[in-house]
């Protein structure tokens, strides 16, 4: 059809600008149709929709994509979201998805899956920036320069057994003498979140009054991960958006529903 590209562009624009409403609309369609529709979207648009979609539906979609597509999507999602999706899959489908993710991403997801849903252990970033306390500041600067993240606020200092010993702010790290061992420049004691803490305990933690991120620890204060304040707000926003989905539907109006549903039919 000569004008088919116009409705295609409109459909995917709606997908990009209204991911929550798109997620709720897509949930009403057969899984195979959803996969076909999303396969035509730009890779950066898919993760945002999956984040708001019913976990069972999103996980089923994920399991039907080719391995390369799965790997791209998982790489674009926070580990906590990927973990939640994998929990919704059967064991066979889950292992297939994890295999497609690659060893590094799969390892992160498996670590989160050891903890109950909605606990700090399941919501954390399982790859906190950390170095042993006997390393020096020069080594720490080199390490931090290689960390690929725009949200690094602190370097966590551990004992050689992996237990948390202290914390060092990035600014402090660059003001200290290069030859200083980390145990001399770190701050202690450290505000930390036990891995089995629930959402309410995480949100109410007094450490947020001082720090932009808090380490998550297991038995004997073994460092497991980190939750940043920005991620905490993001988690709460996702929950709030999902809880208030119906009022948002009415705000957007029936025209959105009609438009996206019929555009999907035209594309497929």
Model-derived features: positions:
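Cytosolic regulatory modules rich in charged/polar residues
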Residues: 2-23, 29-33, 41-47, 52-60, ...
């Amino acid at each position: 059809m000569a004008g088919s590209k116009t409705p295609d562009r409109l459909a995917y624009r709606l997908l990009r600008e209204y991911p929550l409403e798109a997620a709720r609309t897509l949930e009403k369609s057969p899984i195979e149709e959803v996969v076909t529709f999303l396969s035509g979207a730009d890779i950066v648009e898919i993760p945002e929709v999956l984040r708001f979609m019913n976990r069972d539906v999103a996980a089923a979609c994920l399991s039907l994509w080719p391995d390369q597509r799965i790997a791209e999507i998982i790489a674009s999602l926070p580990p906590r979201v990927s973990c939640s999706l994998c929990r919704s899959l059967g064991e066979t489908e889950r292992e297939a998805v994890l295999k497609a993710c690659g060893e590094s991403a799969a390892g992160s997801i498996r670590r989160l899956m050891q903890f109950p849903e909605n606990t700090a252990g399941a919501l954390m970033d399982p790859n906190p920036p950390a170095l042993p306390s006997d390393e020096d500041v020069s080594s720490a600067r080199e390490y931090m320069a290689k960390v690929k993240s725009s949200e690094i606020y602190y370097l966590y200092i551990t004992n050689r057994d992996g237990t948390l010993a202290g914390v060092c702010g990035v600014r402090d790290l660059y003001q200290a003498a290069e030859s200083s061992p980390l145990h001399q420049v770190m701050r202690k004691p450290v505000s930390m979140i036990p891995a089995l803490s629930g959402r309410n305990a995480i949100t109410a933690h007094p450490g947020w009054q001082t720090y932009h991120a808090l380490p998550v620890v297991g038995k004997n204060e073994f460092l497991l991960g980190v939750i940043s304040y920005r991620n905490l707000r993001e988690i709460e926003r996702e929950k709030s958006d999902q809880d208030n989905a119906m009022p948002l539907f009415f705000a957007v109006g029936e025209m959105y529903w009609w438009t996206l549903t019929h555009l999907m039919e035209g594309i497929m």
